[in-house]
Amino acid sequence: MPLSSRGFSAQLWALVGATFLGFLGIGTVLPMLAPHIRYDLKGTDQDVGLVIGIFSFVALAGRLISGPLADRRGRKISFLTGLGCCGLAGAIYLLPIGMAGPYLARIFQGMGEAFLYTGAASWVVEIAGVQRSGQALGYLSSGIWGGISAGPVLGQWVGTFARAAALQMLLAAVAFLVLTQVKEVYHPVPHHGPRTWLPPGILGPGIAIGFVNVQYPVIAGFLILHLKAHGNSGPAAFSAYAGTILLSRFFLGGLPDRIAPAITFFGGLSCMAVGLLLLASGPSPTLAIIAGGILGFGFSFPWTAVVSTVIRRTHSSKRGSSVGVLTAFYDLFVGVSSFTAGAVAHQWGYGAAFVMAALALVAAAIAGRYVFFGQAEVELPRVAATLPGR
């Protein structure tokens, strides 16, 4: 399916739509999961924490498996595997096996999310062409954030955990069927020599991505609690944060393709720092909403700037592995910073956790210097010539 000079093909939009459905299903179960464990299964608060947390560790392992699979067998098989795991997770939730159900389901959920995103991200870049990788990844991220944002609302609407789990299974099945109709043209390049877990040059970009995302568990865990004493503006500020990310990645995701990615990366970090420090100060409701929007706007750019830069330097036979490792850094840093933010907030208050996230951006900027100014895009001409639509 060729790609016109005026826009992206229906093939790419089908991938974005399937991604949206997959993440919509993931988000549908989330608001019901903790009450289901505590009240339906008579679990403890510790069970809730372990069930929620096991996802990140499984996803981390899944990134390292899904990348090589996407490179060797194709992007589609990774994507389909992810959707299949998400559907199985929904089915497992419905099994009458007690507390084993949520644990097992979250294992499949983490693996499914890892395979889904690795396959989708690698595939949309193949379709769009490396020169428009930033815009393609921006559209894909919009599908993810749209699903994550709408999922909890849908879950609350269906009313019960069993219905939410069944809906997750149904949405994954629909996305799976949609994806089977999308033709993939991918010919793996034979690889000579041993494969490594860390593709060359990936450490700097991974560290940059990791420190950028230290803010995410701070926002998810402490924004509402922190702002409760400052006009109770947490829900509105979070909506401004998430909504701005969704809109910015959809409409402005192509900026790293049109201007130097370093500009969008460091500009994004600057906006994030402003937003985090404003939130740390305990602002008024109006200023808190503005700060949430500024933070979300800034957060919209570093990921696409780094990933599109890495993709331009990476041969098509290694792109799946590179995307998988980059997202593994995300999982690692989010997991570690979740515990760190909790300890900081306990010791010095919620505002200190936001300051910690702002300081992490300094480390992200240092790593970014090596990402954007320390390596040339040596493989771009050779790679671009092999991509469809070029």
Residue ranges and their predicted role:
Residues 30-31, 204-238:
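Extracytoplasmic gate region of multi-pass secondary transporters
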Residues 169-188, 367-372:
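C-terminal membrane-cytosol helix-exit motif in multi-pass small-molecule transporters
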Residues 61-97, 256:
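Conserved MFS/SLC helix-loop-helix module at the cytosolic interface between two early adjacent transmembrane helices
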